[in-house]
C-alpha cells in the first residue's frame, strides 16, 4: 500500500480525524488521552458495521488485531489499515516485525514504549489531541529544519559528529570533519547512540541519524538533548535522501518523488523510507560517475561541488 489515507471515525459524542502517510504510525501518550477510545471505536465498527453506533470513513478497510491469535488474523487482512492497542506484547517481537514486512497494510500501533524491532520514522510518532468533541493526531517530534531541540535558533557548530553506523554516511562526514579539524565517530547502530552520548557528556556533539527509522530511540535521546546544551540532533530521512535532495543528480523524477514520497513508496516493498531512498539512489546512479553503494562511499561525493550541495541541505548546521 502507498499514498496518504484519511481516517474519520466517531460517534455522536466524539470524532477522530487524521491522515496516515507511512506503513508504520505510532500513537503515544499517557492514560486518559484517548488512545484506547480510538481503537475501541475501530473495533466496534469492525464488529457492528454500519448498523452500530460508530461511523467510519476511509478509502481502506480498518481492522483491530489483538491477542495470541494475531498471526492468523493478519493472514486474512490485505490492503487495509490495522490498529493495535497497547498491551499487546507481540508488537515488541522480531516475529511481529518479520510478519508485517511482507504485508501491504498500514499499521497504527498504540504504545507507551519504544519498539526497537520496528523501523518507524520520528515523523510518524503522534499523541492524541482532543478538543471538545473532536480528536486528532499531533506529531510528538516535529522540527521544520529536522534539527532538535526545536528551540535551536542559532547555527549549530559542533566539535564532533556522531553517526549511527559506519556506512557511506559516516565516511562522508568523516572526510568533511577531517577538513575542518573535527572528530567524527560512529555509534555502530542506532540503539547505541544513547549510551554513547551518556559516556561523552562533556563533548559538543551533533548526532546525525536516519530520521526514517530513528523513532524507537527518539524519546530517550531527545530527553538527553533537551537537558544538555552541548547536544543537537539532525535527522534527515537518511543519508541517501540528503544526496537525492541536493540536486546533484539533476533528475526530474527524483524531484517529483521527494515532493510526495508517500505516493511512490509501497510499504510492502520497503519496510522503511530509508530503504526506498537507498534503492532509488542506487538505481539512479548505476553506471554513472556517481555510482552509489551503501557500504563504501564513492569519492565522487567528496568533490567540492557534490559535497557542498549535500552540506547545503543541512540548514542551521555549520561545520566551518
Segments and roles (model prediction):
Residues 1-16, 136-140:
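N-terminal pre-Walker A segment at the start of P-loop NTPase domains
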Residues 31:
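The conserved Walker
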Residues 35:
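Conserved lysine of the Walker
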Residues 38-40:
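Post-Walker A alpha-helix
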Residues 44-55:
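Post-Walker A helix-loop "phosphate-sensing" segment adjacent to the P-loop in P-loop NTPases
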Residues 69-94:
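Conserved P-loop NTPase "ATPase switch" module shared by AAA+ and STAND
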Residues 83-85, 104-114:
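Structural recognition of the conserved hydrophobic beta-strand(s) that form the central parallel beta-sheet
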Residues 88-89, 123-320:
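Acidic, divalent-metal-binding catalytic cores of TOPRIM
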Amino acid at each position: 500500500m502507498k499514498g496518504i489515507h484519511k481516517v474519520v471515525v466517531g460517534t455522536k459524542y466524539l470524532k477522530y480525524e487524521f491522515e496516515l502517510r507511512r506503513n508504520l504510525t505510532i500513537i503515544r501518550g499517557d492514560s486518559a488521552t484517548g488512545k484506547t477510545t480510538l481503537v475501541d471505536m475501530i473495533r466496534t465498527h469492525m464488529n457492528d458495521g454500519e448498523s452500530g453506533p460508530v461511523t467510519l470513513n476511509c478509502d481502506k478497510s480498518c481492522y483491530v488485531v489483538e491477542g495470541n491469535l494475531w498471526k492468523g488474523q493478519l493472514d486474512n487482512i490485505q490492503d487495509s489499515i490495522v490498529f493495535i492497542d497497547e498491551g499487546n506484547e507481540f508488537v515488541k517481537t522480531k516475529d511481529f516485525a518479520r510478519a508485517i514486512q511482507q504485508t501491504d497494510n498500514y499499521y497504527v500501533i498504540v504504545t507507551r514504549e519504544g519498539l526497537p524491532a520496528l523501523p518507524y520514522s520520528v515523523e510518524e510518532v503522534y499523541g492524541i489531541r482532543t478538543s471538545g468533541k473532536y480528536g486528532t493526531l499531533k506529531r510528538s517530534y516535529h522540527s521544520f529544519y529536522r534539527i532538535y531541540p526545536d528551540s535551536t535558533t542559532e547555527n549549530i557548530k559542533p566539535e564532533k559528529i556522531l553517526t549511527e553506523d559506519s556506512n557511506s554516511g559516516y565516511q562522508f562526514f568523516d572526510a568533511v570533519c577531517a577538513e575542518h579539524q573535527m572528530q567524527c565517530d560512529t555509534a555502530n547502530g542506532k540503539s547505541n547512540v544513547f549510551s554513547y552520548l551518556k559516556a561523552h557528556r562533556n563533548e559538543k556533539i551533533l548526532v546525525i541519524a536516519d530520521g526514517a527509522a530513528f523513532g524507537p530511540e527518539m524519546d530517550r535521546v531527545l530527553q538527553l538533548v533537551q537537558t544538555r546544551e552541548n547536544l543537537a540532533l539532525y535527522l534527515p530521512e537518511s543519508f541517501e535522501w540528503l544526496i537525492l535532495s541536493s540536486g546533484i543528480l539533476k533528475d526530474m523524477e527524483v524531484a517529483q518523488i521527494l515532493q510526495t514520497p508517500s505516493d511512490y513508496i509501497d510499504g510492502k516493498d520497503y519496510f522503511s523510507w530509508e530503504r526506498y531512498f537507498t534503492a532509488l539512489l542506487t538505481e539512479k546512479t548505476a553506471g554513472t560517475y556517481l555510482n552509489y553503494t551503501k557500504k563504501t562511499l564513492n569519492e565522487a561525493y567528496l568533490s567540492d561541488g557534490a559535497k557542498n550541495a549535500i552540506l547545503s541541505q543541512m540548514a542551521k548546521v555549520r561545520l566551518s
